[in-house]
Each structure stands twice: as C-alpha cells, then as structure tokens.
Amino acid sequence: MNNSSELIAVINGFRNSGRFCDINIVINDERINAHRLILSGASEYFSILFSNNFIDSNEYEVNLSHLDYQSVNDLIDYIYGIPLSLTNDNVKYILSTADFLQIGSAITECEKYILKNLCSRNCIDFYIYADKYNNKKIESASFNTILRNILRLINDENFKYLTEESMIKILSDDMLNIKNEDFAPLILIKWLESTQQSCTVELLRCLRISLLSPQVIKSLYSHQLVSSIYECITFLNNIAFLDESFPRYHSIELISIGISNSHDKISINCYNHKKNTWEMISSRRYRCSFAVAVLDNIIYMMGGYDQSPYRSSKVIAYNTCTNSWIYDIPELKYPRSNCGGLADDEYIYCIGGIRDQDSSLTSSIDRWKPSKPYWQKYAKMREPKCDMGVAMLNGLIYVIGGIVKGDTCTDALESLSEDGWMKHQRLPIKMSNMSTIVHDGKIYISGGYNNSSVVNVISNLVLSYNPIYDEWTKLSSLNIPRINPALWSAHNKLYVGGGISDDVRTNTSETYDKEKDCWTLDNGHVLPRNYIMYKCEPIKHKYPLEKTQYTNDFLKYLESFIGS
C-alpha cells in the first residue's frame, strides 16, 4: 500500500466484516459497527466521548437515538472514505448531524453544497434552517438570496413561514431588491395575508414612508390587517412628522456621463450593484466641455465641442427609461462651452460659459421647457464666467466660483431667485472646475482648480455650504487631487469619481465617511480606464402606476408591474 485511499478502503473492509470493531452506534432498532479510534480521529464529539471516561472502556454501545439514522450512517460511511451523496432533501439533516458530531470536513462540504445550490426555490427554507441552528454563513447567504428575489418569493408557499422578526430584518434592509419603494408595502401586505397576522408599528417603521406614493399609503390605511390596529393608524396619521427617507440601493440607478477611451465617444455607463462594476449601456460620437442636466430621468447634454474645432449649440439627450437618444431638441441660442447645467421641476438651464464667436465669457442664463420650440433668456449673472459650480437648492440657483476675466478664479457665491441676485459668504479660496452636489440640505463642492491668480493648481479640497447659517465648512481633503470630477450622493453617502489628475484621466473613486470626516478610495466604484466622468446621477425608477388613480384593488394593480 502506498497511499491513504488504499488504507481507508482496507479499514472500511474491516468495518463491513466486523473485524476489530469495538463500538456499536445504536439508533432506535438500528446498529452501526465502527472503530473508536477511527471515529475519534474524525469527530470531536466521539473523541471527547471515548477519551474522557464518559463511557466505560468495556461498553460496546453508544445510543444516539435522538439523531437521524440515515444521516449518522451516511456520516460514518463518510468517515470511512465513502463520499457524501448530498441532495436538497438530505443536506440539512446531514449538516445538523455533522454539526452535533463535530465532523468539520463534512460540515464544510454540506455548507459548500448549500451555498452552491442556493436559489429562489429554496432560500427561505435554508434561511429558516440556518436561523434555527445558528449557522451564520448559510443564514447570511440565504438572506441575501431572499433580498434579491423578494418579489418572486411573495407568492412562494414558504413565504408565510418567515417570522415577524425576519420580516422586519428584510423590510429594513437597504439591499431589498425593489425598484420603487411602493413595492415594500406590497411585500408586507402579502406576508400579513399569508400568515393572517395583524400589522404592527414595528413593521410599518421598516417602510421608507416619505418615498411612498399617496395611492399606496391609502392602501395601507384601508387594509383590514392594518386599519384594525389602533397603533398602526396612529402611526400613519403622523407620517408627516417622520424624517426624510433615503432610497434603497436598487430603487435608483447610478448613471454616469463621460468620455470613454473607445475612440473618445460620449459614453453612458450604468453601475451594476451585483457585480460592483460600471457597464456601458450606450455611446455616441465625441463631444467634450458640455453641460449636463437631468429632468424626468432624461439626461440632457448642452453645448461643448464636437469633432470640429468650433463650439456647438446642439442639445442632445439620453432617455434612461427607454435607453434611447433624443436629437430633436431646440438648439441653444448660440454656441457655448464650459457652461453649467441645472434642472428644476419644469426647466433645463444653461448657465454662463464661453461663446463661440470670439471665445468671450458670457453671463447669460437661458432655459428651456420640454415641448417648447426654443430656448428663452432667463437672467444674467453679475459678471461673465465659465467653469463655475452650479446647484439648485430650495428653489434658488446657486453659482459658485468659476473663471472670470483674466483667466483667474473667483470666490464669489451668489444665488438667483425671482427677486434677483443675492450675495452670500464667499468661498474660503478662489476656485473653478469643481464638482457640485446638493446633499442633506447643503451644497458640497470638491476638486477643481484653486488659487487667486493663475489657474493651474489642481485641488483636493472639499467644502460644504450651509444656506441657513450662510457659512462654508472645510471637510477632509480628497486622497487624489482632481479637476472636473463627478460628485454624487447615493444612499446617504457622498462619492467622488473620475476627473483629471496630473494631466491624466483617473478612474479612481472615493467615498466620504461623515462620522470620521475622511475620504477612502472606493474599489467598488472604480471607473473604466481612461474614462472621464462628467457627471453621475442617481436615477429613480418610475412606473406608470405613479399617475394612476387610487382604487380598492390598487395593490393588485401594483403587483402586475413585478418583473417589468
């Protein structure tokens, strides 16, 4: 004999013939012959049992009638070199028995089998099992499978076996795979109906109430399993006082607009949360130095340069709902580049920039309402400028920094309302080409150029502006200085990505930790190589149901959108 497999085969032959066997495993009326030494080498349970005088050395039987005979027999066969034959039907019993007998290699093999075969058909069953036996590895994996397949599972026969504690955990999770928060109450109601359990305030608190449509809130009010509970109605009567909720990960899509390394085309990329990668969903011919604004899930790109040396007045758009380009949009009043783009609930705004005729700066702000045949003059800034930060907050247009006459940066901060322009606290330093975002009631800016005279110092500064106190706060700096990066807010976090650093396109991204006031490089949002990200926008999924009138069977109507 020259290998262990031959030795194991010989020892198993001894067992089958009863040779040298010194212990019998008794399970009800069944007996399994074995050797103490072999069992002790494979099982911590048997090792302790046989070595610490738990049974007399002359005792030839161990009673394990509380265990499943077939599982014990399969595991002892496994100890003697016979592979486990695992199925979805027996793996739970074998794993539970292996865990009791503390057979580590069998436990690992069963766990691998379950993790490999987890799917929507068995995830609830395995989740309930793992929760009962405190197997954190399987519990976590099966729970994540439930989150991914939740809308498929609400009609599963096992859905009713989930406990209220489990439902609270599911409905509270940011990764719940719903594209609109209105589906969360549907999940809750389907579970209540399947269990015939009355609703609780704890379950209602799991919903992102501020994101629900009026139709779904009415559906909650009118459902018997909710309306019959006084505490639930009291809670729903006070939802106006609840804090603003943040969308779940899958209820928005991160869409980036930039220039790809493939023939320098405009590239529209979508972030794949499952793969943690950016995937290009569309592209078109080259353009740069354009402004971007988003209205009704349509991304508008205004002005800039195309493949000619001249600035453009063309406006194109990408519809994220239909995944199609729109070209029949009225042109700007004149060609311009390096301008700012904004949108409110009705209009697209094109702000400042450089005019084509003589490369002069412009102060004009034009706006366009979709369906209108032309752009109209709206206002003028106090001074011509380009490459400034722009933001829409509380109905006001804010213009931040920028490049003014003489190719110098400015530190001005001004806002435009119906009453005209208002000056605010100046920036701590003169800046341009920074990224801007509104988050949690404040304006954040990052990167760009800074300094007072020559525009040539790439910045890693991050600042926030509080409009209530009219003050700027300096936050922790970026790890990588960058100009024209994209700054975005998603899931109550700030991210910055892309841009140009040291004259080279950077594909790095960073995430801001508010509690620690620090930026960390974010490997999950790394951009494609040589990709300049102009802007990143969280796009909220929209459904036709949002314009539907309420009816008594509205939740059934909502259910018809599952899978669309």
From Swiss-Prot:
Subunit record text: Interacts (via BTB domain) with host CUL3.
Keyword Repeat assigned: yes
Gene Ontology biological process terms from the UniProt entry: symbiont-mediated perturbation of host ubiquitin-like protein modification
The UniProt record lists the keyword Glycoprotein: no
Natural source organism: Cowpox virus (strain GRI-90 / Grishak)
BTB domain: residues covered: 21-88
Family annotation (SUPFAM superfamilies): Kelch motif, POZ domain
Major location (coarse): host cell
InterPro entries reported for this sequence: BACK, BTB/POZ_dom, Kelch-typ_b-propeller, Kelch_1, SKP1/BTB/POZ_sf, Vaccinia_A55R
UniProt domain comment: The BTB domain is responsible for the interaction with CUL3 while the Kelch repeat domains supposely serve to recruit the cellular substrates.
Domain of life: Viruses
Gene: KBTB1
GO cellular component, one term: host cell cytoplasm
Keywords, alphabetical: Host cytoplasm, Host-virus interaction, Kelch repeat, Modulation of host E3 ubiquitin ligases by virus, Modulation of host ubiquitin pathway by virus, Repeat, Ubl conjugation pathway
Domain BACK: 123-219
First and last residues of every Kelch repeat: 252-297, 298-346, 347-395, 397-441, 442-492, 494-539
Function: Probable substrate-specific adapter of CUL3-containing E3 ubiquitin-protein ligases which mediate the ubiquitination and subsequent proteasomal degradation of host target proteins.
Protein's name according to its UniProt entry: Kelch repeat and BTB domain-containing protein 1
Localization per Swiss-Prot or TrEMBL: Host cytoplasm
